[in-house]
A protein has these predicted regions:
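Membrane-interface extramembranous regions
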Residues: 2-158
């Protein structure tokens, strides 16, 4: 008697994706951390643009606007660096810093918009120089990223 062997080709089992292995909670945590980091970098860019305007474009001699540019840089630096600290125990601080980053970006955008159309504290800006375009882009990215970060946090808690 001959024995018939069943012929089969062995194929290696595909490796599951990291996202499948880690589950939705870890994926959400990664997305949250990525959004927080993106928002932090955008806030730091907003501050850097204001520092550049303060020092290089001589906004430091404009009476009220100059000190506001310096304060914007200082606030953006504190907020951005605080958001980059990756400690799980700082969740409440990250929440407050994200709200602060959104507030800083929205306020910067609003003050620029006002100063383009009428004098603000005795100063009126004009045109869209490269610095203004970079600041507007960074402010938009900061708001979108930090709002999305807060939304992922809220969804994870629910």
């Amino acid at each position: 008697m001959t024995r018939l062997r069943e012929s089969s080709t062995y194929t290696a089992r595909p490796e599951p994706d990291e996202a499948v292995l880690s589950g939705p909670a870890e994926t959400s945590s990664r997305a949250s951390a990525s959004l927080r980091t993106l928002g932090a970098v955008a806030v730091l860019v907003v501050g850097a643009v204001h520092l550049d305007e303060y020092l290089a474009d001589h906004f430091n001699v404009v009476p009220v606007i100059g000190p506001l540019f310096a304060l914007n840089f200082a606030g953006a630096t504190l907020i951005g660096l605080g958001l980059l600290v990756p400690a799980a125990r700082l969740r409440l601080l990250h929440l407050l810093l994200a709200l602060g980053g959104i507030g800083l970006a929205v306020t910067s955008f609003a003050f620029l918009f006002i100063s383009e159309h009428q004098p603000l504290f005795g100063f009126q800006d004009y045109g869209y120089r490269m610095e203004i375009v970079v600041a507007l882009g960074a402010e938009a990215v900061a708001v979108v990223a930090l709002v999305a970060y807060l939304a992922t946090r809220a969804r994870r808690r629910a």
